[in-house]
Amino acid sequence: LHLTDDQAKQQGARCMDCGIPFCMTGCPVNNIIPDFNDLVYTQDWKSAIDVLHSTNNFPEFTGRICPAPCEAACTLNINDDAVGIKSIEHAIIDKAWENNWVTPQVSTNKTGKNIAIVGSGPAGLAAAQQLARVGHNVTVLEKSDRIGGLLRYGIPDFKMEKVHIDKLKVVYSSEIQDASSLKMTDGTNY
């Protein structure tokens, strides 16, 4: 569900910033949910995307396809509807793309180490991004004609449009070398 700015603000205002944020324990990537909810409530969208990116490589995907166990863990869920955390995450990343806040973070401290990542699914892309950001030269090897792995070939378009994968490829191509044309030559089908 895509939220307008006002709807996102209303959902963010519902977050109680619990002493023990059960929503965070429900989140598989440990997003700092109360913080970005508050930032959306105060309409500080730039800080909200910074907080979200501090724990989540690809909110473009999780904001659309995650089953949202954070919402099941939300304290409000006891006697009311949970905060719409997944929809807030979706709104944050969409606002970040609209304002060109999703940019490559090229490391200035190069290590000189070359690393190959086999496969460009979500795990491969996240590993490549993290390794590139600490200064390694990273090449992603992909046997298919386009990057994305399960994101591209396993998730139907009505769940997540593939344009989000293509946008990321353009932005992060300065961080990560795309070697999708390379194949393993020893006969191994990876």
Where are the regions that the model predicts?
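Core beta-strand elements of the Rossmann-like FAD/NAD(P) dinucleotide-binding domain
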Residues: 188-190
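Beta1-alpha1 glycine-rich phosphate/pyrophosphate-binding loop at the start
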Residues: 1, 30-42, 47-52, 56, ...
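Conserved beta-strand elements of the Class I
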Residues: 116-118
